[in-house]
Curated annotation (Swiss-Prot):
Keywords: Cytoplasm, Metal-binding, Zinc, Zinc-finger. It is found in: Cytoplasm. GO terms for molecular function: zinc ion binding. GO terms for cellular component: cytoplasm; nuclear envelope; nucleus. This is Zinc finger TRAF-type-containing protein 1-A. CDD domains: CYHR1_C, RING-HC_CYHR1. Residues 1-56 are annotated as: Disordered.
Amino acid sequence: MSEEREAPGPLASSSAGLGAEVGQEEVPGGAGPARLLLLPSDSDGPPKKRLRSEAEPGSVRLEERLYSVLCCTVCLDLPKASVYQCTNGHLMCAGCFIHLLADSRLKEEQATCPNCRCEISKSLCCRNLAVEKAVSELPSDCGFCLKQFPRSLLERHKKEECQDRVTQCKYKRIGCPWEGPYHELTVHESECCHPTKTGNELMEILDEMDQTHKKEMQLYNSIFSLLSFEKIGYTEVQFRPYRTDDFITRLYYETPRFTVLNQTWVLKARVNDSERNPNLSCKRTLSFQLILKSKINSPMECSFLLLKGPYDDVKIHPVIYHFVFTNENNETEYVPLPIIDSVECNKLLAAKNINLRLFIFQIQK
């Protein structure tokens, strides 16, 4: 008949020092020595909490773990387009890669990888097609129906297939302002009153639409005129978030210095014109100012506008602004960033950085 053996003294004492008790388990059938079990004691914290924390790594879904593996080492976001890697394999999205090269040019330094500090350039870095394909297969939420789809199929789903996507009435051409989810479109069009309006009523609506169209054409004609100027410069700019040093800090954005038209510039942006508590407002806006950092010999008259960058999908209506820069007056007023609505503004605020493209046209007399 076998006996249960007690744990040796040193083991019991050392286990107690670790905040655990030594328990005994009888071997089934009475064969062989008993095994020692370490049981959590009260001093080691709630057992349920310990078990949950131990189970966390395995409970996280594969795609969620891949987000941190495949994200850009600079902005920590999943790449939306091309993915570049340094000679040691660290990943950078196309936007951040271009910014690193541009910043190094301004500082007259060799661009380096933010992780390992190895040299990077267009010739030293290469695209990682495997990561690009892996990212395109990761699931992402549709902003309308909140269902998940592979990132490569999400755009098509949002434009053509989603039953909750925002759509417009087919009678928009004769003035119907209705917008709503696609699954309500058929019911609305069957009840829409615009097809039954008289010719005189429709003429008033069409006159208003003509005025709107005329303003849009004036804007595009102005842009085409600017494109005929001799001195034109453009660059991708990256607004980075910062906090003021006030007692109640406020969010603002600023770009690194960049060079356009042989001059050094900076862009700054603020939320809701720096109101005290923008988080309490349901309406969100962004405004920006252009600052000339270089010294100039004579006044510099410029037109400028911001557009969406090549690697982002923010919706911006182009607006042309005009300013005469001098050494004494080198900052424009804060002007609205022409995003279409508060939803788009929230998308920008939720991103790590805001990537846009700036055009500057120098007006010569």
